């Protein structure tokens, strides 16, 4: 265990870190002309479909951890990959991914309200480091999303419970059977890791911890053969 992780065990350190993270997030939003801060309860939002009871409170990925996870990718060149965020909320992770030259970026969000905010943020986003300009917010239930048959990085920040997670992973597994390709799944706060690990076409690549933020990385079987 690193000394940084050990320090985060102390309540005072965690509180100071939380305050610093929130202030840094608001500064980053202001600098990039977007509004991605704030938690949202899906039960208080307009949503598509009937799975609102299976959604988890929206908490945006911190800028720091998001950039760390993207730097930690097992891909030397992302230009041939599509970035997909399932449960993309206000679009923060889409904008962080745009700092890398992905082929394109897709955000899937079932809340009409959050999708509208994400679209607004994509339009107003200003960042001289932006390397991908094809950002596509999609308003739909994740269980209905058809994964594109191309190399992809799929990001999940514990967006929904097992009722939704299972069909999503089953759809991905089926897509990999029909179109074998390199796919990486980054699952932050991997509460339902057993659901992902039950997929026959995915294997555990790494289990990581960044300042107390746990995430698992999975990769399609075809990439390791």
Predicted features, each with a name:
Residues 163-222:
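C-terminal substrate-binding/active-site "lid" region of AdoMet-derived donor-dependent transferases
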Residues 80-89:
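Conserved class I S-adenosyl-L-methionine
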Residues 137-177:
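Active-site segment flanking the S-adenosylmethionine/decSAM binding pocket
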Residues 91-95:
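Glycine-rich SAM-binding Motif I of class I
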